[in-house]
Amino acid sequence: MLYYLFEWLHKLNFPGAGMFGYTSFRALMAVILALLISSIWGDKFINLLKKKQITETQRDAKTDPFGVNKVGVPSMGGVIIIVAILIPCLLLGKLDNIYMILMLITTVWLGSLGFADDYIKIFKKDKEGLHGKFKIIGQVGLGLIVGLTLYLSPDVVIRENIEVHTPGQEMEVIHGTNDLKSTQTTIPFFKSNNLDYADLVGFMGEHAQTAGWFLFVIITIFVVTAVSNGANLNDGMDGMAAGNSAIIGATLGILAYVSSHIEFASYLNIMYIPGSEELVIYICAFIGALIGFLWYNAYPAQVFMGDTGSLTIGGIIAVFAIIIHKELLIPILCGVFLVENLSVILQRFYYKIGKRKGVKQRLFKRTPIHDHFRTSMSLVEPGCTVKFTKPDQLFHESKITVRFWIVTIVLAAITIITLKIR
């Protein structure tokens, strides 16, 4: 909203109004404003949660030995993150930009889904929360909306990067002058760092392009669901999900910025995405909101984000990566979320195999995997064998959290580096 006001003032030659025309200025304003909202207003909101007794309820020490110490800590703090994202974006962003619109829809959509889950847990005293199938329906629905919008909207275009080889000279990367609707996505080790989904269904002949878009929509749904659930599982220790997501967000911000700048896109040999500069405003608000929230969520946590926050930030990361055509970098960048997901899936699969044989068995002492590193064998179900018992030394949750942050930083660096691998 302020963007349009200052654009009007700039036309009237109002001093300083032209600053709002610079993406870098609005991005810095977004991160500062989001940080202030989440840290200053966040404190007041936490006190309100305490007053209304919107807190973690009693946990069963047998099924959740680590949760018993968290009883009484305010939950649903994800509202702080959501508000701190929305306000800067509404004030500083171009609200007619299709990418900004999609990100705002994602924030509200998954925020509402997570809020419903937390509401049922806290106010209805149902520890299971929203039924799993409704969560999946919500995530799939969002993935479908995002995928179809990117397919159908005339504003969603790219300019393809083209490698020009001249004998005796270094390869030069140029971008086409025409805006294209494309099913291409960025992936290292492929020609021009691009993979076209339509090429994967080339056997369909003249229908390959349409089939490529169909495949893209399916992948969009899968990525949104997987990353959203991964972030949800990662939110098991104080500061864990917020810290990891801020690091991932910063990396996505770099990728969005270089994708929106034709010279940087040429240097990295990636596609140029007109209009994606508005995503830099959004992701800066996202980072600022998470850092401000981390002020209260770091160990010992004064507030938990709940599913209101974790489902939302996971979905934001997924949709953002899809919009900038970097979704196939997610397994690297969001490696921590991927491992959290896989640990739970493998644990259940291994348990079911043992159950068929009449044997109690586990792959890990406890999942998601971050809990494995702080769980002693004495907390494992009696008579149950565990495949992987290492490490013998147990770690405090703050040490595990920081180490997971370090792993995410390394994965973020690898993600950026892969773009220069030929």
Swiss-Prot record:
One of its GO terms (biological process) is cell wall organization. Signal peptide: none annotated. It holds the Pfam family Glycos_transf_4. Keywords: Cell cycle, Cell division, Cell inner membrane, Cell membrane, Cell shape, Cell wall biogenesis/degradation, Magnesium, Membrane, Metal-binding, Peptidoglycan synthesis, Transferase, Transmembrane, Transmembrane helix. The keyword Acetylation does not apply. Its cofactor is Mg(2+). One of its GO terms (molecular function) is phospho-N-acetylmuramoyl-pentapeptide-transferase activity. GO terms for cellular component: plasma membrane. The chain crosses the membrane at residues 28-48, 71-91, 95-115, 136-156, 211-231, 239-259, 279-299, 313-333, 399-419. Pathway: Cell wall biogenesis; peptidoglycan biosynthesis. It is found in: Cell inner membrane. Its EC number is 2.7.8.13. It is a multi-pass membrane protein. Its main location: membrane. Belongs to the glycosyltransferase 4 family. MraY subfamily. Catalyzes the initial step of the lipid cycle reactions in the biosynthesis of the cell wall peptidoglycan: transfers peptidoglycan precursor phospho-MurNAc-pentapeptide from UDP-MurNAc-pentapeptide onto the lipid carrier undecaprenyl phosphate, yielding undecaprenyl-pyrophosphoryl-MurNAc-pentapeptide, known as lipid I. This is Phospho-N-acetylmuramoyl-pentapeptide-transferase. It comes from Bacteroides thetaiotaomicron (strain ATCC 29148 / DSM 2079 / JCM 5827 / CCUG 10774 / NCTC 10582 / VPI-5482 / E50). The lineage of its organism: Bacteria, Pseudomonadati, Bacteroidota, Bacteroidia, Bacteroidales. The gene is mraY.
